[in-house]
Amino acid sequence: MNDTASEKVKNEIKESINILDEQDAHPRRPRSKYAGEMIQMDASSFHWIEGEVWHLHVAIDDADGKVVGAYFDRQETLKGYYEVLYQILINHGIPAMFYTDRRTVFEYKRKDRSSDAEDTFTQFSYACHNLGIEIKTTSVPQAKGRVERLNQTLQSRLPVELRHAHITNIEDANVFLNSYIKKYNNQFALRLNSTKSVYEKQPSMEKINRTLAILSTRTIDSGHCIRFDNKYYFPVTENGDGRYFAVKD
């Protein structure tokens, strides 16, 4: 082959290869080194049982691929993510970081949500802040590929398992998840040395309950009560004695 022909072949090869710009490329990222270093979190909407569309909230450890939390709800909700975080705290401890989609991580108060219970952006972020958990977000699905692949795997496998177990409602489905996730981890999670973990010690149940709460600002009225969900509450001390506050003008 002469030089002219050789150069022509090289040019044809270059033209046939679509080279991406660096900013558009999403190369495979190596796993985290330690368990608890990064937890990828997401929710997926799917027909998990016939005639029902639920949202499965899941969390997977980036280091070993272990599913560390899973919970069904009818929508993508604060409760769903709180339930997942509760499972992580109880079974593993406090992770270092959550990595999730900007649409589903809860960092900023949404102006279109009037209810405190719906304001997941403020509530979840505040809970993580109190526990010392960093929240990192991305708008690129490929960046959190492990949880995306987990969603795909569960969508192909879990409906079959739910049908075989004769699950017909969301309450029983959440109970079933406990045994199913253990089975899934035994089959797919990597076996890492247990010392390679950065999970912090599990907080007390009192701290967990106080942290995974819906916080709401209310004003004491002239009758020394607060109003919440159209009900009035009278503040008391730990001993049950009435607590009175001066009302600001």
Regions inferred by a protein language model and the residue ranges of each:
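C-terminal, beta-rich DNA-binding module of retroviral/retroelements integrases
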Residues: 19, 181-249
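Acidic/histidine-rich, metal-coordinating catalytic segments
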Residues: 89-116, 141, 197
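Charged alpha-helix within mobile-element recombinases
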Residues: 117, 123-193, 199-210
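Mobile-element integrase/transposase regions
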Residues: 1-67, 78-96, 125-130, 224
